[in-house]
Swiss-Prot record:
Signal peptide: none annotated. The lineage of its organism: Archaea, Methanobacteriati, Thermoplasmatota, Thermoplasmata, Thermoplasmatales. GO terms for cellular component: cytosolic large ribosomal subunit. Transmembrane segments: none annotated. NCBIfam families: PRK04243.1. Belongs to the eukaryotic ribosomal protein eL15 family. This is Large ribosomal subunit protein eL15. One of its GO terms (molecular function) is RNA binding. Coiled coil: none annotated. GO terms for biological process: cytoplasmic translation. SMART domains: Ribosomal_L15e. HAMAP family: Ribosomal_eL15. It comes from Thermoplasma acidophilum (strain ATCC 25905 / DSM 1728 / JCM 9062 / NBRC 15155 / AMRC-C165).
Length: 197
């Protein structure tokens, strides 16, 4: 079987995961993931088709990390000071970032010498969502000598995940669409609000 045929087969298995033969294996793995640490460096990607499509290469300078994030909305400590009821909210608060972006940021915190290239979903249970994050060592010779990925070593791409420059960051900022209705997203939601004052 060619590599493209293999990736296609893996993609089809993950598309209909609950009907697939690997579902029981994934469920068993998620039980282990739930009780393990929240960020784990992996030897190989779990979904080789997604990793390759998003730029992963099996060579020095690239690593894959599994990141675990708690599902659901956000909450904060109960406010004890006085205020009107509308401003006392402490649960059912919607996050301003996606869980995927939070997973990327946590992986970047764990490996400060590396840049986040991209990430993909690998599963969820009742409590957590799991993502695998592709990280690149910006100072590795394999990286800055590779014409396809050397751009990540340039200074303007340092800390890109914290500035919303990954795919998940673009989506959260509303920059995926360029059609009618997206005018308030540019140059950013915050600065657009300032310009309109």
């Amino acid at each position: 079987m060619s590599s493209s045929g293999l990736y296609q087969a893996v993609r089809e298995e993950w598309k209909s995961l609950k009907k697939s033969e690997i579902y029981d294996l994934v469920k068993k793995r998620m039980i282990e993931w739930r009780h393990g640490p929240s960020i784990v460096r992996l030897e190989h990607p779990t979904r080789i088709d997604r990793a390759r499509a998003l730029g992963f290469k099996s060579k020095d300078g690239f690593i894959v990390v599994r990141s675990r994030v708690r599902r659901g909305g956000s909450n904060r400590e109960k406010i004890m000071g006085g205020r009107r009821p509308r401003r006392m909210a402490y649960n059912k608060l919607t996050r301003k970032k996606s869980l995927k972006l939070i997973a990327e940021e946590r992986a970047a915190d764990k490996y400060p010498n590396m840049e986040v290239l991209n990430s993909y979903y690998v599963g969820e249970d009742g409590l957590y969502k799991y993502f695998e994050v592709i990280l690149v060592d910006r100072s590795h010779p394999n990286i800055f000598n590779d014409p396809h990925i050397s751009w990540i070593s340039e200074p303007q791409n340092t800390g890109r995940v914290y500035r919303g420059l990954t795919s998940a960051g673009y989506k959260v900022r509303g920059l995926r669409t360029g059609r009618k209705g997206s005018s308030k997203s540019r140059p950013s939601i915050r600065s657009n609000g300032r310009l309109r004052r």
